[in-house]
């Protein structure tokens, strides 16, 4: 079976494509199909933006499509400074990975150098008739103003996010770290959601 993943983010593709391939699901990408549309993400939360992406790419290709979006919430920030659905878009400008690290390091520094944050994820599978939704979150982690040197292309904040349970940057987590902190690593549940809804 083939499914389109409506993202250009190489880290998201890598994170899920290998595990889905093990379940005999081939993940096609926007790049694979040479699609050059960019739906406007006007949703109020991760599920709404995931639906917008999934429907737009399904309408373009007629291939069952996965849309995914992330929201970032930072406990110590006032509402007007919350990234929410606009993690990459700051003041109307889309930031690249380096721009995100610079912006968020400065923001964290402004509020004391260490902030408590949480990712909330939304995934939608759309097949032209109906949509299936799944939402999950990672437990709280810390954003710090001193990023490590290593980078995870497509997930730049992994270089400045620390898992409190093991005091490691996300970019340095091993599979063993993730398995020990199972609450923080829910990808198997996401894979089950995809497999069960195709």
Q: PLM features: what roles do these ranges have?
A:
Residues 2-4, 11-18, 23-198:
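Anionic-ligand binding patches
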């Amino acid at each position: 079976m083939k499914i389109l993943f409506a993202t250009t983010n190489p880290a998201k593709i890598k994170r899920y494509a290998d595990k889905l391939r093990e379940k005999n699901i081939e993940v096609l990408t926007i790049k694979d199909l040479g699609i050059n549309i960019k739906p406007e993400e006007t949703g109020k939360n991760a599920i709404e933006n995931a639906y917008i992406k999934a429907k737009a790419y399904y309408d373009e290709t007629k291939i069952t499509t996965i849309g995914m979006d992330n929201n970032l919430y930072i406990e110590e920030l006032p509402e007007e400074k919350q990234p929410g659905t606009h993690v990459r878009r700051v003041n109307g400008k889309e930031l690249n990975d380096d721009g995100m690290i610079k912006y968020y390091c400065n923001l964290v520094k402004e509020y004391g150098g260490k902030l408590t944050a949480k990712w909330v994820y939304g995934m939608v599978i759309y097949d032209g008739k109906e949509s299936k939704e799944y939402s999950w979150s990672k437990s709280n982690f810390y954003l710090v103003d001193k990023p490590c040197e290593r980078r995870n292309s497509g997930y730049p904040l992994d270089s400045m996010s620390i898992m409190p349970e093991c005091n490691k940057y996300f970019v340095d987590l091993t599979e063993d770290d993730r398995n020990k902190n199972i609450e923080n690593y829910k990808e198997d549940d996401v894979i089950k959601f995809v497999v069960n809804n195709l």
